[in-house]
């Protein structure tokens, strides 16, 4: 718009619900969750079923702690295998709940991953997994917009392009739209005498 990029849309891999209506016992509490794939396997958890409170900067440390415990327990207890790829574990836990900004977002999340980290964005693969879950539950149709908000207020727009199959699973093709800002410019040089100027391969 007026010579400026206002958004970038990508079409993601097939997303699908792997297992639904699961529970895991964490510190004596049974927590319901769903395993869905959106590029990685996610455990999706409804925060209204928990007693931590709304998703915001103050509660994120508690969600991180719970998410790490859940991820470890789920991978110990649930056999996971992508139907066509060599992916065999839940990598991320996605907590979702009401947004305090319903005028510009549908729902809010915090995605826990890695070494006790929280995604500052709504997570593209996580948004894809959420779209697949909502579609499976009959809560969103093809072409309908879903605006996912992170705990710091950044948003992604998700739309289901079409339905498909992945192995024996009903799946959807998600389209994710987001924005970014230019923060710097770099210059890379090739020295003709550099023996590794074109890189190298291992294995």
Model-derived features: positions:
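Active-site proximal loop and beta-alpha junction motif in alpha/beta enzyme cores
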Residues: 1-203
């Amino acid at each position: 718009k007026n010579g400026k990029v206002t958004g970038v849309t990508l079409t993601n891999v097939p997303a699908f619900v792997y297992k639904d209506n699961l529970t895991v016992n964490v510190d004596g509490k049974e927590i319901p969750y769903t395993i869905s794939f959106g590029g990685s396997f996610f455990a999706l958890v409804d925060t209204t079923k928990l007693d931590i409170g709304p998703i915001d900067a103050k509660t994120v440390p508690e969600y991180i702690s719970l998410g790490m415990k859940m991820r470890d327990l789920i991978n110990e207890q649930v056999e996971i295998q992508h139907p066509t790829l060599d992916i065999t574990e839940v990598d991320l836990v996605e907590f979702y709940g009401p947004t305090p900004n319903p005028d510009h977002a549908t729902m809010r999340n915090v995605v826990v991953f890695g070494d006790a980290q929280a995604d500052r964005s709504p997570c593209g693969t996580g948004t894809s997994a959420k779209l697949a879950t909502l579609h499976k539950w009959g809560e969103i149709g093809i072409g309908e917009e879903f605006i996912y908000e992170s705990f710091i207020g950044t948003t992604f727009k998700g739309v289901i392009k079409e339905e498909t199959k992945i192995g024996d699973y009903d799946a959807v093709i998600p389209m994710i739209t987001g924005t970014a800002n230019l923060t710097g410019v770099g210059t890379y040089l090739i020295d003709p005498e550099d023996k590794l100027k074109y890189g190298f391969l291992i294995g």
